[in-house]
A protein has these predicted regions:
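Conserved catalytic-core segment of nucleotide-activated headgroup transferases in glycan assembly
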Residues: 1-28, 100, 137
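C-terminal alpha-helical cap of glycosyltransferases
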Residues: 132-152
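Hydrophobic/aromatic beta-strand patches that form the interior of the parallel beta-sheet core
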Residues: 17, 36, 52-54, 72, ...
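Catalytic binding pocket for nucleotide-activated donors in carbohydrate/polymer assembly enzymes
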Residues: 29-31, 59-127
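Donor nucleotide-activated moiety binding/catalytic core segment of transferases
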Residues: 20-62
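Short, well-ordered alpha-helix to beta-strand connector turns
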Residues: 13-14, 50, 68
Length: 152
């Protein structure tokens, strides 16, 4: 993605923070003061200050989805990626946010700010079914079951 172009489309009131894949961590994409490289930052710390999360096919979306914040999926090469790498889910129907193919579509999604957060809730129910506040209870039940089978 051309972050300079995206920033130009969004305007000066927007700050773009980016963190590249670890294999690309030494790359600097832009020297613009409102386009900030966060490659050395903890990704999970960035989640809390992020208004919109833009990703491609990264599994990090599963972690970010718990934040219940808008996500945009940049899939400029979706057909090629499906063919060469493969995707285990129905990308166009399951992504909990707009799928965009260029910087203009990404910018328009942000500027319109009309995200359906209920799609994220559906996504989380499917992929985070145990994130329900009852994990400790399940672990205790499992421990008790194991202990009772072992005669403890």
């Amino acid at each position: 993605m051309d972050l300079n172009k995206l920033h130009e489309l969004l305007g000066e009131e927007y700050v773009i923070m980016y963190k590249l894949h670890p294999l690309l961590k030494n790359h600097i994409i832009s020297n613009h003061p409102n386009i900030i490289c966060c490659n050395s930052e903890n990704l999970y710390h960035l989640f809390s200050i992020t208004d919109y999360f833009i990703s491609d096919y990264s599994a990090i979306i599963f972690d970010f989805s718990i934040m219940n914040k808008p996500m945009i999926f940049y899939a400029f090469d979706l057909d090629k990626y499906k063919e060469e790498t493969g995707i285990f889910l129905d990308y166009l129907n399951e992504m909990p946010g707009p799928v965009c193919y260029n910087e203009e579509e990404v910018a328009n999604s942000i500027l319109a700010d009309e995200f359906d957060l209920s799609k994220i809730e559906v996504f989380c129910r499917k992929y985070h079914k145990y994130n329900d506040g009852h994990s400790l209870s399940r672990v205790l039940t499992l421990i008790k079951d194991i202990m009772s089978k072992d005669g403890a």
